[in-house]
């Protein structure tokens, strides 16, 4: 079984979605079940409703799952596993207070050395502390694993101390809950971000202590860097939020296409998730950080907009008139996102705001003169744009730039865009709706 294990503590990050997509693809390729595990044991950081938001995003991406579980439902199991380790002398109670440990951390910082917990501290405050934590005994050997992307990774014994499994309130730490659940659900491969590399040896030690003889394969994805700063994209970066990208009008299929493409060797530029299942391979992923490029994402989104069928296009733009499909297709050529397309069609159909767009009083006056001339015309009486244009020029007594710029604004709501002769047939059939001024 493969899994995706998000925490409901904020917006879904593009790095997390990338991991979800890759786990889903490999699960499909290997004909294995796919598990979604909501890691909700950190009650203080959980945000209500974020779990459902994550699930909705996965559905939008075309990702389905065979099983959905909440980690908090397994707490009794986690405690049972901790008790097992205590009985087998693989774990121990630690009575050292948080204040004592904080002083030791500060001392290590001042001495410019890494902080390492010492097992001899375990009973120092046993008489005063009646709520101990449970720690796994530190290993006396190196921990190594063969990462599917990073290759051989090794941690020396002095890099790993006796870390906490259960907190004072008997709640499991992230690493303990994660390792226990991965065993419980028989997870065979975990694809996740490289920020989890330091967690992996701890989880391996926990699983070994619990008697696992079937090691999990790990694949740690390189981080995604911001295209401008070159730094890791954090949750503070708008574009790192999948929700933000969707709200900006990026199609789910384009987002998935892009996240599969970056840092990867792909056989074609534009593809669907189902197509990627046919050829995706972890071996083709680069070990170097990927750079996020919003301009290229917009390019891919533009290509996917062109691929939308008529029914989907009308639904996504909230246009009910099928006669406007051709116009939508023309506007797509100038749009990178669904939001841009919606804005174009809205400007086209809504009353025109010449106050907002006029350059000076003379320009506003020309707009009004031309507007009155156009109102007297029956657009459907003209066989083509050329004959319509000549009559509009004659009636308004305007020509050149004084004619064309006001004409474009009055007919499309925009000072630039698709050539007017191309969209004139759609203007003809909707001219009474189009030719209106904003009060």
Swiss-Prot record:
Motif 'KMSKS' region boundaries: 232-236
Protein's cellular compartments: Cytoplasm
Residue positions binding ATP: 235
Entry annotated with the keyword ATP-binding: yes
Catalytic activity: tRNA(Glu) + L-glutamate + ATP = L-glutamyl-tRNA(Glu) + AMP + diphosphate
Organism: Helicobacter pylori (strain G27)
Disulfide bonds: none
Motif mapping: 'HIGH' region: 6-16
GO molecular function terms noted in the UniProt entry: ATP binding; glutamate-tRNA ligase activity; tRNA binding
Gene3D superfamilies (alphabetical): 1.10.10.350, HUPs (3.40.50.620)
NCBIfam families on file: gltX_bact (TIGR00464)
GO cellular component: cytosol
Protein name per the record: Glutamate--tRNA ligase 2
Job description of the protein: Catalyzes the attachment of glutamate to tRNA(Glu) in a two-step reaction: glutamate is first activated by ATP to form Glu-AMP and then transferred to the acceptor end of tRNA(Glu).
Statement: the UniProt record of this protein carries the keyword Translocase: no
Sequence similarity: Belongs to the class-I aminoacyl-tRNA synthetase family. Glutamate--tRNA ligase type 1 subfamily.
SUPFAM superfamilies: An anticodon-binding domain of class I aminoacyl-tRNA synthetases, Nucleotidylyl transferase
UniProt EC number: 6.1.1.17
Quaternary structure and interacting proteins, as annotated: Monomer.
Primary residence: cytoplasm
Enzyme superclass (EC): ligase
InterPro entries per the UniProt record, alphabetical: aa-tRNA-synth_I_cd-bd (IPR045462), aa-tRNA-synth_I_codon-bd_sub2 (IPR020751), aa-tRNA-synth_I_CS (IPR001412), aa_tRNA-synth_I_cd-bd_sf (IPR008925), Glu-tRNA-ligase_bac/mito (IPR004527), Glu/Gln-tRNA-synth (IPR000924), Glu/Gln-tRNA-synth_Ib_cat-dom (IPR020058), GluQ/Sye (IPR049940)
Gene: gltX2
Gene Ontology biological-process annotations: glutamyl-tRNA aminoacylation
Keywords: Aminoacyl-tRNA synthetase, ATP-binding, Cytoplasm, Ligase, Nucleotide-binding, Protein biosynthesis
PANTHER family: GLUTAMATE--TRNA LIGASE (PTHR43311), GLUTAMATE--TRNA LIGASE, MITOCHONDRIAL-RELATED (PTHR43311:SF2)
């Amino acid at each position: 079984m493969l899994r995706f294990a998000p925490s409901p503590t904020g917006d879904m990050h593009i790095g997390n979605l990338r991991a979800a997509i890759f786990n889903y693809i490999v699960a499909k390729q290997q004909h294995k079940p796919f598990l979604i595990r909501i890691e909700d044991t950190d009650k203080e950081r959980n945000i209500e409703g974020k779990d459902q938001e994550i699930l909705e995003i996965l559905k939008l991406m075309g990702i389905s799952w065979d099983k959905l579980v909440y980690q908090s439902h397994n707490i009794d199991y986690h405690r049972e596993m901790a008790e097992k380790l205590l009985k087998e002398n693989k774990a121990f109670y630690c009575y050292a207070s948080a204040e004592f440990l904080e002083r030791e951390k500060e001392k290590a910082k001042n001495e410019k050395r890494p902080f390492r917990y010492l097992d001899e501290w375990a009973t120092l405050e046993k008489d005063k502390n009646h709520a101990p934590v449970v720690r796994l005994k530190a290993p006396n050997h190196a921990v190594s694993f063969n990462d599917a992307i990073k290759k051989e990774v090794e941690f020396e014994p002095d890099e790993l101390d006796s870390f906490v499994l259960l907190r004072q309130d008997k709640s499991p730490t992230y690493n303990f809950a994660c390792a226990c659940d991965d065993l419980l659900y028989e997870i065979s491969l975990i694809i996740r971000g490289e920020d989890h590399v330091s967690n992996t040896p701890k989880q391996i030690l926990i699983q070994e202590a619990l008697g696992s003889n079937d090691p999990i394969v790990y694949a740690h994805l390189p981080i995604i860097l911001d295209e401008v700063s070159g730094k890791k994209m954090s949750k503070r970066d708008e574009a790192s939020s999948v929700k933000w990208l969707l709200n900006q009008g990026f199609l789910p299929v384009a987002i998935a296409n892009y996240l599969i493409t970056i840092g990867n060797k792909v056989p074609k530029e534009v593809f669907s998730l189902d197509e990627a299942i046919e050829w995706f391979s972890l071996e083709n992923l680069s070990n170097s950080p990927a750079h996020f490029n919003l301009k290229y994402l917009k390019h891919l989104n533009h290509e996917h907009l062109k691929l939308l069928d008529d029914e989907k296009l009308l639904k996504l733009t909230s246009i009910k008139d099928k006669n406007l499909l051709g116009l939508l297709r023309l506007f797509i050529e100038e749009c990178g996102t669904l939001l841009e397309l919606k804005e174009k069609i809205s400007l086209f159909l809504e009353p025109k705001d010449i106050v907002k767009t006029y350059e000076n009083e003379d320009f506003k006056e020309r707009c009004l003169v031309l507007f009155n001339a156009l109102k007297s015309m029956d657009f459907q009486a003209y066989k083509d744009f050329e004959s319509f244009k000549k009559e509009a020029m004659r009636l308004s007594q305007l020509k050149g730039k004084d004619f064309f710029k006001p004409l474009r604004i009055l007919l499309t709501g925009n000072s630039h865009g698709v050539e007017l002769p191309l969209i004139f047939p759609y203007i003809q059939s909707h001219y009474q709706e189009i030719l209106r001024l904003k009060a």
